Amino acid sequence: MEEIRELVLKYALINAYTHRGKANPKAVIGKVLGENPELRKRAKEIIPLVNEVVNEVNSLSLEEQEAKLREIYPEFFEEKNEKKEEKKGLPPLPKAERGKVVTRFAPNPDGAFHLGNARAAILSHEYARMYDGKFILRFDDTDPKVKRPEPIFYEWIKEDLEWLGFRIDEIHIASDRLEIYYDYAEKLIKMGKAYVCTCPPEKFRELRDKGIACPHREEPVEVQLERWRKMLNGEYREGEAVVRIKTDLNHPNPAVRDWPALRIIDNPNHPRTGNKYRVWPLYNFASAIDDHELGVTHIFRGQEHAENETRQRYVYEYFGWEYPVTVHHGRLSIEGVILSKSKTRKGIEEGKYLGWDDPRLGTIRALRRRGIKPEAIRELIIEVGLKRSDTTISWDNLAAINRKIIEPIANRYFFVADPIPMYVEGAQEFTAEIPLHPDYPERGVRRLKFEPDKPVYVSKDDMELFKPGNFVRLKDLFNVEIMEVNENGIRARFHSFEYEVARENRWRMVHWVTEGKACEVWVPEGDELIIREGLLESDADVKVDDIVQFERFGFVRIDDVRPEKVVAIFAHK
């Protein structure tokens, strides 16, 4: 038994180490018995041992857990380092030194985090971990007018990243750093590398497109500083003055020519700073300053934002800084799923969607609500990798990855959609004992009792099988012959118990329940949300957030458990 205890301790420590210090007894049991099938016959004595060891491990600090794991199983850390690049398939980073890589993810908290954003976030985090570096979460919230941040999204984004398995080393919020941006803006003005433009926007655009300098561009530094102070003091109104970075007026892309760095927003009503500040940096200026200030070494950026680097390099060159290594990748989308924050917001406001976690959406919260595991999302992003071309994945791709992860952990139950009563003649009382999971008998069984004077319920989806003269097998119960179908239900007659009879005759198998509990399953179908009403096994032991398999229906996540009804959300087949 001591050898088994050592084995359990090893798996408990590994599970705790990879799950922020909290080992899961079920996961440890599954690992012990799954990789040592000869122990399954001793499951009853091993389960209490696992619970005891897991409690001991969970009482240790993270540092104590790691030290103990290194003591009894140092190979884990060697294998872990070897597998990082092999398993995940990410190529080496250019100019990357172990322990010195710093990456960042800079979302705008104006909406929920979605699968499209996840590409840059996951790549940034994976490489930071691969090189034992640092991962920074930086909220880009300096546009209180067009992309207005909302307090809830700061928390949601952080929660979503942590759910995805991120270890966030630092968190910075751009709106807390306005004074820093002001200092750098003033330095650039004093250096003659930036100026305050008071041209009407249309006039500047006309000059820019012709490659002609704005009349304020070469005015003395003293004049520029005076205008700058007026911007800060509120003497200019919104749209009357802009700080611009001097660039090449003949650059082939007009948007790069003397691009705007800071502008005025009257009454910003920012959720963090209120109306304290009126001068706000635009993305490229704030990002350039922060990437330097925070020591970012590598940036992962969508191909559509490649021009940002061109703009920001002017700031870096003027200060003599080295620009971070930039890795561009294509956009990621999923067939039939909306990722656009503006379209999602509009749909929510119009009542089309239930919220940011509506299971039809592609937000991380929606995917989580639907039963997609964080490991599946990470694996998908890593599989796509650093391709520069845009990538559209099908739901089936994500489902296939998720299925591998949840199949071993999902207990099985019968759910009968659109139930129809079936009255079986000639059968005696019988209790079917069905494994919660066919591959893990140690989890126990469900018991469904058939009583001759009560009907069983079968699904309307199987109506084509219920024709007089047909034979079907009620799964894990017995075989019946269909005698009659009418408006009151189905009349059938007991034929035999043996599964072999059904198999030899190729009779179809259907699932069933007796007196089940009311259950509805929400099934996302493109832009539609179909609600399937039905019955779930009356003794089904399900809790909110459980992921289970409704046999012959699909994998679902339990969304709500009420006294009168269970609500589940369909994930995939």
From Swiss-Prot:
KW Hydrolase (keyword) present: no
EC number: 6.1.1.17
Record bears the keyword ATP-binding: yes
Gene Ontology CC, one term: cytosol
Top EC category: ligase
Entries under Pfam families matching the protein: tRNA-synt_1c, tRNA-synt_1c_C, tRNA-synt_1c_C2
Catalytic activity: tRNA(Glu) + L-glutamate + ATP = L-glutamyl-tRNA(Glu) + AMP + diphosphate
Keyword set, alphabetical order: Aminoacyl-tRNA synthetase, ATP-binding, Cytoplasm, Ligase, Nucleotide-binding, Protein biosynthesis
Short motif ('HIGH' region): ranges: 107-117
GO biological process: glutamyl-tRNA aminoacylation
Localization in the cell: Cytoplasm
Primary location class: cytoplasm
MF term (GO), any: ATP binding
Its job: Catalyzes the attachment of glutamate to tRNA(Glu) in a two-step reaction: glutamate is first activated by ATP to form Glu-AMP and then transferred to the acceptor end of tRNA(Glu).
Family recorded in the similarity comment: Belongs to the class-I aminoacyl-tRNA synthetase family. Glutamate--tRNA ligase type 2 subfamily.
Protein name, per record: Glutamate--tRNA ligase
